Every structure is written in C-alpha cells, then in structure tokens.
Amino acid sequence: MAGQKIRIRLKAYDHEAIDASARKIVETVVRTGANVVGPVPLPTEKNVYCVIRSPHKYKDSREHFEMRTHKRLIDILDPTPKTVDALMRIDLPASVDVNIQ
C-alpha cells in the first residue's frame, strides 16, 4: 500500500469523546508503524434554535438552544495491512461518527 493515504473524519457533539477517540486512533496507528498527520481540529459547526417559551403567546419571551458539532481530521500515510487490520478492530464510543476514505 505504498504511496496511499487513509483519511479519517471524526464528528461528535462531545469534545472530550472525540479527543479520546482521536488519541486512541493515533496510538494504534503509530504502534503498527504507519505515519500519522493529525488530529487536525476542523471548524466547529454551531446550530442555534430559537424557541418561544410559552405555548400560545408572549412572543418576546424566547429561549435559545445550541448544538455544537466538533470535527477532527486524521491522515494516515503509507498504511500497512497491519494498520488497516488494527483500525478495523479498534473500539470507539457510539457517540463518535467515523468516516473513513
């Protein structure tokens, strides 16, 4: 697999979970002998929802809720078959979305 690259994108609402997952992936890849670039923090996506507090009137009384999506990018350069096998067996939390390209 010389000259190839694996790109892993992580998404999560909890920054501690995504950082722990990224750390676990980097440790696994370094142990198998491949080169790692990252984790690179990508811009955090922030969604703000405005809701009227009262069910019928009092439009001036509103409440704001926000949802932050944290993202990280990890590039694995020159992966070996051992690296790919170790990545398939790694156990990550369900709250972290992993996209491998």
Curated annotation (Swiss-Prot):
Gene3D superfamilies registered for this protein in UniProt: Ribosomal protein S10 domain
A matching Pfam family: Ribosomal_S10
SUPFAM superfamilies: Ribosomal protein S10
TM region(s), chain numbering: none
Coiled-coil ranges per UniProt: none
InterPro entries membership: Ribosomal_uS10, Ribosomal_uS10_CS, Ribosomal_uS10_dom, Ribosomal_uS10_dom_sf
PROSITE patterns: RIBOSOMAL_S10
Keyword field: Ribonucleoprotein, Ribosomal protein
GO MF term set: structural constituent of ribosome; tRNA binding
An annotated GO cellular component: ribosome
GO biological-process terms attached to the record: translation
Known partners and oligomeric status: Part of the 30S ribosomal subunit.
Function noted in UniProt: Involved in the binding of tRNA to the ribosomes.
Similarity field: Belongs to the universal ribosomal protein uS10 family.
Protein name: Small ribosomal subunit protein uS10
Origin species: Mycobacterium leprae (strain TN)
